Swiss-Prot record:
UniProt GO cellular component terms: cytoplasm
The EC number(s) this enzyme carries: 2.4.99.17
Keywords: Cytoplasm, Queuosine biosynthesis, S-adenosyl-L-methionine, Transferase
InterPro entries registered for this protein in UniProt: QueA, QueA_dom1, QueA_dom2, QueA_sf
Protein name per UniProt: S-adenosylmethionine:tRNA ribosyltransferase-isomerase
Classification lineage: Bacteria, Bacillati, Bacillota, Clostridia, Eubacteriales
Principal EC category: transferase
Major place of residence: cytoplasm
The reaction(s) this protein catalyses: 7-aminomethyl-7-carbaguanosine(34) in tRNA + S-adenosyl-L-methionine = epoxyqueuosine(34) in tRNA + adenine + L-methionine + 2 H(+)
Top-level taxon of origin: Bacteria
Annotated GO biological process: queuosine biosynthetic process; tRNA wobble guanine modification
Location(s), subcellular: Cytoplasm
Pathway in which this enzyme or protein is active: tRNA modification; tRNA-queuosine biosynthesis
Source organism of the structure: Clostridium botulinum (strain Alaska E43 / Type E3)
Amino acid sequence: MNVKDFDFYLPEELIAQHPLEKRDTSRLMVLDKETGEISHKNFYDIIDYLNEGDTLVLNNTRVMPARLIGEKEGTGGKIEFLLLKRVDKDRWECLAKPGKSARVGRRFTFGDGKLKAEVVEVKENGNRIVEFYYEGIFEEVLDSLGEMPLPPYIHERLEDRERYQTVYSKENGSAAAPTAGLHFTEELLHKIKEKGINIAYVTLHVGLGTFRPVKVETIEDHEMHSEYYHLSKEDAEVINETKKRGNRVISVGTTSTRTLETIADEDGNVKETSGWTNIFIYPGYKFKVVDRLITNFHLPESTLIMLVSTLAGKEHVMNAYEEAVKERYRFFSFGDAMFIK
């Protein structure tokens, strides 16, 4: 299947640059995966499409303020590190900008010397392994000095960094937010629980690979990046009981979907487990556990639009995206949502 099959025209002004004042007032396109029928709602209407006994699966990862801007010791030259993943207690794999400044042995300082760093290795892919030196707790130091690593298509500064976190975010480790979850408020989640809908959590730490364009012509040739995931025993039991009763598992976001489909056996059962996944879901894949999906509007030719097309049918999805452009929906991380019912 050709990557170009997932292209569509998107005017730049439809790329949302900031979140709406109230999370659940974003628009919601409801797409029937069987008929392709489309209806236009607001996100707070999602509760009308959830039935008692269903389980909503949320990714509770938390975005780290992983962008550090500092200077080279001695010369004061500027450096930017983007923390990708922890490889040891105080060692992180990072992207460095400008790369030529970040040679092995070079030392850098951040925030009046509150945090120091040394490049200890340059990997084949150009990423750096960086050792950090600090006093206290690293997460707290990072919280005071780091900036949110917003996606490359967002050019406006984010006033409130909590708006790039879900209200239920808990486990630190992502370089990007699981954006389908940004629409939920505490109040909406409370109403959902009151209706008898279960809530289960997975953790998948979203990597920067989520923004990496597909550079091959044939989608089968694309290799996905690896991301760390975890599912607890309690949450696995909630999901298995839901399937056993004949109720639906409704995944919030492509990250929750990829986690569940990685863990599920052929019968759709899941169990407590942790690991790394590079699962790539594209048309032809048969879903084992996910029945319905809440997601945002994704980039043309992205692996995310391919995943959505696998659940709802490519023709239905491409028609829905054409309609979304015509109706001037807001796209990408701070944009509107779609429910595939």
